[in-house]
Amino acid sequence: MASLATKALALIALLVATVVTADAHDERLGAVTFPTSCAPTVQAQFERAVALQHSFWFGEAIKGFNAVAQADPSCGIAHWGAAVAWLGNPLAGPPTPRGLAEGSAAVARARSAGAKTERERDYIAAIETFYKDHDKTDHKTRAVAYEKAMEALARKYPTDREAAIFYALALNVTLNPNDKTYANQLKAAAVLEKIFAEQPEHPGVAHYLIHSYDFPPIAPKGVTAARRYAQIAPSAPHALHMPSHIFTRLGYWQESIETNRRSAEIAKAELRQTNLEAGSYNALHAMDYIAYAALQLARDRDARAIVDEVRALNKIDSEQFAAAFAFAAIPARYALERRAWGEAAELALHPKSLSWAKFPQAESINAFARGLGAARGGNLAAAKQEVTRLSSLAYAMATAKNAYWAEQSEIQKLAVSAWIARGEGRNDEALALMRQAADREDATEKHPVTPGAIQPAREMLGELLLELGQPAKALAELEASQKIDPNRLHGLAAAARAADAAGDRAKAKSYATRLLDLTKTADSERPEIVNAKAFVGAN
């Protein structure tokens, strides 16, 4: 049962919500209420740090929590905040070794400082369940233990909305990527939707609702949160990026470009204040989404500008997985979406200074792009070398118990192997391999780090069937792919061709018209656009 003092604090919180602002810069981070027993003079500063944390601005959040602890050494809950921030993006994977060390130290400082209320001590104990024995217990086990601790905390203090919000985030961290009922996600969303109605300016609620709905069948439920989040916390780079998770799911490419451009600009501006030579991993993450969206609109010059900017970077401000992923994905997407097979086959890992061995799941993208480019470009020997490389990377990830990404590499290997089989005339085997890749990809979910598969396997299956003279079957696969990845340029183009070849001129014209509408701001004359114009003009 929550104490009367805690209930009183919660009541005060409902009456007086702190809108987090910074006078010097007119900072807008949203409205957060987190009552504490710390000195009243640090309360607003503490809530600002919590708001920064809810928008995944980890470095600034850590600075904020540490400043609170320095101003009020007895404020143990400030060290709790730092420990939470040192997790980094919990949806992207485990913390870095430094994050684990710093987070553990923050928990120890929280214990030493001594929180004045049972509620605050419970928060500290909850985060301690994640860091405890991190050198002996695997990440997943500790993440689940933390989720259960936050569930207990939220139940113990039913009027404490922050406890419920952090619990909802924990549910998204521990979700089963193979669960197509989306049990954890919908459970989290139910918690968050209730709070969203009460606190429509809360950054964490909108943020975590987007993550909860970031899955094809339920993505439309996230539109409201997506459109609100950037308005709630426009000073935070991640808040400007996050709406694009939903926009991408629904094929709203221009909206994705616009919100990610703002996100990247803020992230790069922040970095320029401290480091003029390194790239920002926050900006790179947004730039991957921009490039992906621009390529769907055939805005190839816009995408090329992103590629050139990435290639000019020789180091990164923080070796985060999101940065490594973007470094590998952006040039791969640029080559493959333009069907520049030779260019894809020659892609090199960049920058060389990055510790690529730490990120085999990112290196796998490079191997996939090189392999697919070589296979479809006719260099089957080179493609087979990349299949071997993908096998090694998948094995390394499986050995490290990184099952999700090991499976993604296996799917990539199957796809490249399918096109190799096609190149060698083993057409039945090619179809079997590609269907296996598509089915296995459908059985998993997109990771939050990526706007989408580098090349969707079911879309490739449709293209392969079309190439092998089976247009009706191709159309069925392409339409299924569009349900998962709507408004993809190549998906629409292939569907138009398949429908035409299958004798359905009306459907072919519909897809071709959609393609032309999609690419009306194109800055390149892709063959797909030329063909669609000719078809629509003749029909």
Predicted regions and their residues:
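TPR/TPR-like (Sel1-like) alpha-helical repeat modules
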Residues: G76, A83-L87, P95-A115, T248, ...
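Generic long, charged, amphipathic alpha-helical segments
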Residues: Q412, A430-Q482
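C-terminal structured "cap/appendage" subdomains that terminate the fold
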Residues: M460-K533
